[in-house]
């Protein structure tokens, strides 16, 4: 090989290096080009010939002008800031003649060059649904299987654009109908998902496998079932298998249930689909239909689902309907005989921070009054969860929800499992609201425990933080809570209401010191230092003999041999603010 270099060559190299150096210096000159946008910098390196070519390509009726520019061969290889060469520009123009001129002027090595998104000229023509351009490029040997950087093929792009003729053209020129694209999906996957019936027929006739599984294990049939495309499902069912499971063991019937099309569900059952195959999470098709609120699909699935499979799953469709706030589905399930007191299995409820168990808890958490009424009327028990349903309703301050739960036996004397107080926990949510406070007290709240203090008239021990122990909040007395600096102003009103529900009580020195500063102290002092009325004492005695559960039971009260006026008195109807239509209880 001849390694000789002439002086002329050295001079040319020197000139070239000097030009490059000056260009770089201009780019990094302070306060100027270094702050220029990236696309402007790239645009400045494009030749004038390139700009002329592109301008001519993008103007209609400029074939002759473009022909005169074909002599600038190197300009046809230049790319703009998004990687488009003139051939890419020509591929998306309506004028096929422009594309022919540009292709002939471009080096064959550029015919498969990609943009920054990995798109070839053919891919762009297909995406633009330009059939003549795509035909010309295919005739000149362009690859019909060249995928872009997202992993999509020209055939898949034709399916997405719903361009049947384009898809047929690509297949005729060798496009692989079984080519795996993004997430291992084929063109048949997309056609089935989008409901392109003619495309699905074309793919199947052209040799597409009917059951390819995507990265997540979905077949075209599963995707068609999700969207409820029954005609496509029937085509695929004749060709493929119904028993393919996704990577999470989700059956095709479960996917149909999630879509909610009753015809799709019925079709799969007709072809032998099993409604008792759970996915990895344990959910069955009936669970998914109930959770999504697909009433018609649920009607079909109820008779074909085994109760043993539901029990094994650890969750009832009643839970799902309540969680999704679908009272119509809930009513259907109750009418079908599903147990409203079915409790979540431990392996399911451990995924919830509150370890909820009952369907009623889901409904209460959603403030779904319709579902709560249905469940309680069907016999749902309100005291089955680690966190009491009443506590959730009190925290939300929902009067109607609280009233519903109390009328159906919610325990007003529950204790929180974490840091329990000496008095029942429900009271802490009602200190600022007389309506809620009266509700609790009317339904048998243990008011006497609020006045239970071992220190009596003695000086109370002081803590590191006023009102709280230095370690765990446990067995904290009412006097320690209500005398906190941010609650003291409520103490008089709260204690005055409580006195309507107790016999003679003694208040400790700590509580008394705070009450004496309240404007209502004189009334409280009068009640504490005088005998209670006989009528009041009789009411307390009757309530104690009846018990809390009998007090809230309308049937029991109806059989009680007492005048209605006396029954109302026993039930504290004169203090039933919610029943009287008073819905603002803030002090």
Curated annotation (Swiss-Prot):
Disulfide cross-links: none
Similarity-based family: Belongs to the ankyrin SOCS box (ASB) family.
Record-level GO BP terms: intracellular signal transduction; protein ubiquitination
ANK repeats: 82-112, 117-146, 150-179, 183-212, 216-245, 248-277, 281-310, 313-342, 355-384, 385-414, 416-449
PANTHER family associated with the record: ANKYRIN REPEAT AND PROTEIN KINASE DOMAIN-CONTAINING PROTEIN, ANKYRIN REPEAT AND SOCS BOX CONTAINING 14
Gene Ontology CC, one term: cytosol
Protein name as it appears in the record: Ankyrin repeat and SOCS box protein 14
SMART domains xref list: ANK, SOCS, SOCS_box
Keywords: ANK repeat, Repeat
Pathway(s): Protein modification; protein ubiquitination
Gene: ASB14
Quaternary structure annotation from Swiss-Prot or TrEMBL: Interacts with MAPRE2; this interaction promotes MAPRE2 degradation.
Domain notes from UniProt: The SOCS box domain mediates the interaction with the Elongin BC complex, an adapter module in different E3 ubiquitin-protein ligase complexes.
Function: May be a substrate-recognition component of a SCF-like ECS (Elongin-Cullin-SOCS-box protein) E3 ubiquitin-protein ligase complex which mediates the ubiquitination and subsequent proteasomal degradation of target proteins. Plays a role in the inhibition of cardiomyocyte nuclear proliferation by mediating the ubiquitination and degradation of MAPRE2.
Domain SOCS box as annotated: residue spans: 521-576
Gene3D superfamilies named in the record: Ankyrin repeat-containing domain, SOCS box
